[in-house]
Amino acid sequence: MERRGSNLPSDSLLEGAAAWREDLEAHAESVHSQGGEDGVLLRLFERIGVRSRSFVEFGAWDGEHWSNTANLRLNHGWQGLLMEGSDRADGQLVRRERVDAENVEALFAKYGVPQDLDLLSIDIDGNDYWVWDAIRNYCPAVVVVEYNVFFRPEMARTIEYDPAHAWDKDEYPLYHGASLAAFCKLAEGKGYRLAWTEPWCPNAIFVRAERLPRGVVLPDWRAWTRWDWSLDDYREPTPRPGGRWVAV
């Protein structure tokens, strides 16, 4: 596997795209997040504006460890819904809910999530693609997802939808989630642009295109690819028994 650096498009938009990237990289900082998301999110909301200081995050663990929303909640006056399917949820700060494509919008309604929430963070190590796809009546300004890095950049793949899926990180650690290309295709269809990926963590941040400042130029999504795999020895990750990868 080869690490990829700045792979910016060599056209007349290079300067603007590079400026966007350099600005976010300069603001990357972790207070509670895993790989700089705290600082990047603050900078993004400085640029696109905030409506209600509202968020939803699942799976949220204990609401603080590697959380993409804890800094906003604890230090910047935001409020929102935290959900986690495991026993890490305390039932008060973090609601114990198993989120899937069938129940995600019902859960949003149950807990009074505003339709125009500011931030949605998805990290459930499984049906992430399908759950975001199922969110049709809510329109977050920014969406953070964890993607599967073990695909070549052009491969748009996700696990087959299975509401009972549980990540087997010991026996089949690579069978989870969806590739960056898959999320980018889904995001484009929903009206989002890829605004950032973490240099060392498999997290991607998407912003609604209509919320971007007028005239801003974002790098092409391929410029955000942080990992690459040689064609000579590449093998698609092995699915667990009964599972399969789906091209999207």
Model-derived features: where do they sit?
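A short alpha/beta connector and helix-capping loop motif
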Residues: 130-168
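SAM cofactor-binding core of SAM-dependent methyltransferases
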Residues: 25-115, 119-122, 126, 149-152
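Secondary-structure boundary elements
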Residues: 114, 137-139, 189
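Short helix-to-loop capping/linker segments positioned immediately adjacent to catalytic or ligand/cofactor-binding
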Residues: 117, 131-132, 191-195
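A short helix->loop->beta-strand "cap" motif at the edges of active sites that frequently abuts
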Residues: 76-78, 139-141, 192
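A structural signal for short, well-ordered beta-strand segments and their strand-loop junctions
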Residues: 82, 121, 142-146, 193-199, ...
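Rossmann-like AdoMet/SAM-dependent catalytic core
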Residues: 3-56, 68, 107-109, 154-248
